C-alpha cells in the first residue's frame, strides 16, 4: 500500500496532463467563437500547449535531480492547476494562447516522472502491473480527450474544459507532497547546469513543433516562417546534440541511445505516438468534415476505442506474467496495423456502427504497444541514466504524434486534390451514371426551388460536394494505409530487442 497509493496519485496527475493534450480538439471552434478568434488563430490553442510541453519533457530528468520527484511533481501539479484556471478565465485569444502555453510548460513534468517512479515503487513481476497502468493511461487519455471535451462543451460550455482540472489538480498536489518520498533535491546542480544547451534545445524543439503543427496550413516551404523554423530547428538541435555529447553535465544524456533496447524502444514509442495521435486526429476530422457530426456525436462514435483499451488491460497483465514481452508487443503492433488496414476501407457513409470493429481492433492492443515498450526500453538502463532517459522516451512518443499528425495533414491535402482531379475527370456527358444522377438531382431540386435554372445550379453544387466528399474519403484511406506501413516496420524490428527480466530489487541510488 505504501507504493500503490503514491503511485496512484501520480498516475491521476499524469492522466489529467495527457487528457488536456486532446480535450480541446473537438471544441476548438467553440473556444474560437467564445473568444472572437480568427480561424488561423484557433489552432494555437492546441499548438502552444504542445510546443511548451515538448520542451520541458526531455528536461524532466535533470529537473527531478534538482528539485526531487516529490517537489517537482507537486510544483507541476500546482502550476498546471493554476494555469487551467487562467485558461478558463481567458478574455481573448492572446491570453488563452499564453495560458495554454503555461499549462503545457508547468504540467509536462508529471508525465515522464511517473515512468521513472514506477521503477522505484515496483520490482520484479509487479512492474508488469505498473507498466500496464502507465500504458493504459498513455493510450486512453488522449483517446478520451475529444469524447470528454465534446460532452463538456455541449452540456456546459468550453470554460469547463479547464475548470474540471481544478479539483483533481489540487488533490494531486496535496497528496504527492505528503506521500511521495523517493529522492532528495540537489539544488547545487543549478550552478553546473548547461544553460546554453537548455536554450538550444528549447529553440530547436519549439521551432520543430511549430514547423510540424503549422506546416500543412501554410503550405510548408512555400511560407518563409515555416522555412525559417525548419532551418532554425535543424541547426539548433544538431548543436544541442553535439554539445550534450561533450559537456560534463548535460541536461539530456544522449549516450543512453547506445543501449540497443532503449534506442529501439524510443523508435517504437515514436511509432506508437504516430498511431495513437494520428488516429485521434483523423477519425474526428472525418466524422466532423465528411459526415458533419457534432462534437458530442463524434465523441460517442469513437468511444469504443477507449472502452476496448480498458478491456485489453487485464488480458495484457495475464499474458505479460507468462510470456516474453517482445512477442506480446509484436502482437500489439501487428493488431494496430491490422486496425489501420481495416480503416482503409472507409467510405463516406461510415459512422459509429461501421467504425465499431475497426476501433475495437485499434483500441484493444494499445496497452500491448505502450506497456512493453516501457519495460523493454527503460528496464535495461542503469539506474543513474533512468531519469534522463525517461524524458527522452516520452518526448519520442509526443514527437511521433506531432510528426504523424503533420504527415497525415499533408497527405489529406495532397491526396484529396489528387483524387478529386481523378474523379472529376469522369464527370462528363459520356458518363451515363453521372448524367442520370445529375438529371435526377436537377429535377428534384428544381421542384423545391421553383426554377429549372436554379435547380440545375444547385444540382451541380451538390454533385461537386459529393465528389469532394469521395475524394476526401479516399485521402483518409491513404493516410490510414501509411500508418499501417509504419506499424508493419515497427513489428519487424521488435525481435531485435533483448529480453528484459524484471529486477527483484531496486538499487538504492536508482532515484
Regions found by a protein language model. Give the residues of each.
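Cytoplasmic loop-to-transmembrane helix junctions
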Residues: 41, 126-133, 385-392, 475
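C-terminal membrane-cytosol helix-exit motif in multi-pass small-molecule transporters
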Residues: 166-185, 202-214, 232-246, 491-498
Amino acid at each position: 500500500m505504501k507504493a500503490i497509493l503514491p503511485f496512484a496519485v501520480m498516475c491521476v496527475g499524469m492522466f489529467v496532463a495527457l487528457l488536456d493534450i486532446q480535450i480541446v480538439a473537438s471544441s476548438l471552434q467553440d473556444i474560437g467563437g467564445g473568444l472572437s478568434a480568427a480561424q488561423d488563430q484557433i489552432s494555437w490553442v492546441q499548438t502552444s500547449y504542445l510546443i511548451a510541453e515538448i520542451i520541458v519533457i526531455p528536461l524532466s530528468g535533470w529537473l527531478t535531480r534538482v528539485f526531487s520527484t516529490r517537489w517537482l511533481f507537486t510544483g507541476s501539479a500546482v502550476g498546471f492547476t493554476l494555469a487551467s484556471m487562467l485558461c478558463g478565465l481567458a478574455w481573448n485569444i492572446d491570453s488563452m494562447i499564453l495560458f495554454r502555453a503555461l499549462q503545457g510548460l508547468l504540467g509536462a513534468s508529471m508525465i515522464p516522472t511517473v515512468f521513472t517512479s514506477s521503477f522505484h515503487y515496483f520490482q520484479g513481476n509487479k512492474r508488469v502491473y505498473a507498466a500496464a497502468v502507465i500504458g493504459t493511461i498513455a493510450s486512453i487519455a488522449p483517446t478520451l480527450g475529444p469524447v470528454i471535451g465534446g460532452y463538456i462543451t455541449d452540456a456546459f460550455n468550453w470554460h469547463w474544459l479547464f475548470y474540471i482540472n481544478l479539483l483533481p489538480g489540487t488533490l494531486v498536489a496535496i497528496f504527492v507532497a505528503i506521500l511521495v518520498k523517493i529522492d532528495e533535491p540537489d539544488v547545487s546542480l543549478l550552478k553546473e547546469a548547461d544553460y546554453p544547451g537548455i536554450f538550444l534545445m528549447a529553440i530547436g524543439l519549439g521551432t520543430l513543433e511549430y514547423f510540424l503543427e503549422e506546416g500543412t496550413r501554410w503550405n510548408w516551404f512555400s511560407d518563409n516562417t515555416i522555412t525559417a523554423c525548419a532551418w532554425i530547428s535543424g541547426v539548433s538541435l544538431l548543436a544541442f546534440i553535439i554539445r550534450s555529447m561533450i559537456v560534463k553535465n548535460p541536461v539530456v544524456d544522449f549516450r543512453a541511445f547506445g543501449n540497443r533496447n532503449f534506442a529501439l524502444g524510443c523508435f517504437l514509442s515514436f511509432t506508437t505516438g504516430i498511431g495513437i495521435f494520428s488516429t485521434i486526429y483523423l477519425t474526428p476530422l472525418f466524422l466532423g468534415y465528411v459526415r458533419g457530426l457534432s462534437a458530442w456525436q463524434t465523441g460517442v462514435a469513437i468511444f469504443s476505442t477507449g472502452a476496448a483499451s480498458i478491456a485489453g488491460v487485464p488480458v495484457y497483465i495475464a499474458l505479460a506474467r507468462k510470456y516474453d514481452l517482445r512477442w506480446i508487443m509484436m502482437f500489439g503492433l501487428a493488431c494496430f496495423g491490422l486496425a489501420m488496414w481495416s480503416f482503409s476501407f472507409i467510405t463516406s457513409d461510415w459512422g459509429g456502427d461501421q467504425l465499431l470493429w475497426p476501433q475495437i481492433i485499434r483500441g484493444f492492443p494499445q496497452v500491448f504497444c505502450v506497456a512493453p515498450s516501457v519495460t523493454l526500453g527503460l528496464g535495461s538502463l542503469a539506474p543513474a541514466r533512468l531519469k534522463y532517459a525517461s524524458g527522452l522516451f516520452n518526448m519520442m512518443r509526443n514527437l511521433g504524434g506531432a510528426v504523424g499528425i503533420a504527415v497525415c495533414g499533408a497527405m489529406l491535402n495532397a491526396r484529396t486534390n489528387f483524387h478529386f482531379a481523378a474523379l472529376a475527370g469522369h464527370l462528363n456527358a459520356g458518363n451515363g451514371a453521372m448524367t442520370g444522377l445529375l438529371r435526377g438531382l436537377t429535377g428534384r431540386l428544381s421542384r423545391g426551388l421553383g426554377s429549372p435554372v436554379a435547380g440545375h445550379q444547385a444540382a451541380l453544387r451538390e454533385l461537386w460536394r459529393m465528389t469532394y466528399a469521395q475524394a476526401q474519403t479516399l485521402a483518409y484511406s491513404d493516410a490510414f494505409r501509411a500508418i499501417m506501413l509504419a506499424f508493419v516496420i515497427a513489428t519487424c524490428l521488435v525481435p531485435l530487442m533483448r529480453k528484459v527480466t524484471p529486477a527483484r530489487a531496486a538499487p538504492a541510488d536508482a532515484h
